[in-house]
């Protein structure tokens, strides 16, 4: 789980060399194999009826994108043909050099989930801690504005013994949400999503 945390906090520089074929949907369909089905529009979206293999998708990177609440000067996207994730910026496009309008890309936007989704993880963690005094302090820390900052301070500064447990809960839930998002977009099948959820339950809390 520590490796997962490091993966999710990797800097934007890892995406600077990402390049995706600038292929229109019409051109792609014209070159499609017999196994390719028609696309159905939704959002940016053109979603293939055939599914991606979840094992080839960077679930942790999608989780990072879903949690990214920063701004709209950069956006995360996924290629529905390959499952590869890319970072687009308004100044440097996808390749870090050439600006391109995001609407011109045959990629699917990964919009961040609302902050209350991630807030619930903190609340559940505080509620699940066995030591009642520690649990109360954590619960108090997530009340009102500044909850994320106060909770982080409580865990990292005052209860470092809980850091690994917090990372474990936070990361596994983030990964499950990433898989649920892929399912909602029609990129993976229900069986794969259900199996992932079964294989990645919430960890026990101290």
Task: Label every PLM stretch briefly.
Residues 166-206:
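Acidic, proline/glycine-rich low-complexity IDRs
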Residues 8:
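Cationic, low-complexity basic patches in intrinsically disordered or flexible, solvent-exposed regions
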Residues 20, 35, 39, 46-47:
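Aromatic (phenylalanine/tyrosine) cluster motif
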């Amino acid at each position: 789980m520590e490796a997962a945390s490091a993966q999710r906090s990797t800097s934007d520089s890892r995406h600077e060399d990402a390049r995706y074929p600038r292929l229109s949907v019409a051109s792609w369909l014209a070159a499609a194999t017999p196994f390719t089905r028609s696309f159905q529009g939704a959002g940016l979206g053109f979603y293939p009826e055939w599914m991606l293999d979840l094992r080839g998708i960077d679930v942790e990177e999608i989780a990072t994108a879903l949690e990214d609440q920063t701004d709209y000067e950069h956006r995360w996207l996924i290629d529905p043909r390959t499952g590869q994730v890319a970072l687009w910026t308004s100044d440097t496009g996808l390749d870090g050099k050439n600006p391109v309008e995001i609407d011109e890309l045959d990629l699917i936007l990964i919009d961040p989930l609302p902050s209350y989704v991630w807030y619930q993880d903190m609340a559940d963690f505080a509620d699940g801690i066995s030591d009642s005094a520690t649990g109360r302090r954590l619960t108090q820390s997530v009340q009102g504005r500044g909850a994320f900052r106060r909770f982080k301070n409580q865990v990292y500064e005052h209860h470092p013994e809980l850091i690994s447990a917090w990372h474990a809960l936070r990361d596994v839930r983030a990964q499950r949400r990433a898989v649920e998002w892929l399912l909602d977009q029609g990129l993976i099948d229900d069986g794969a999503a259900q199996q992932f959820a079964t294989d990645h339950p919430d960890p026990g809390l101290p």
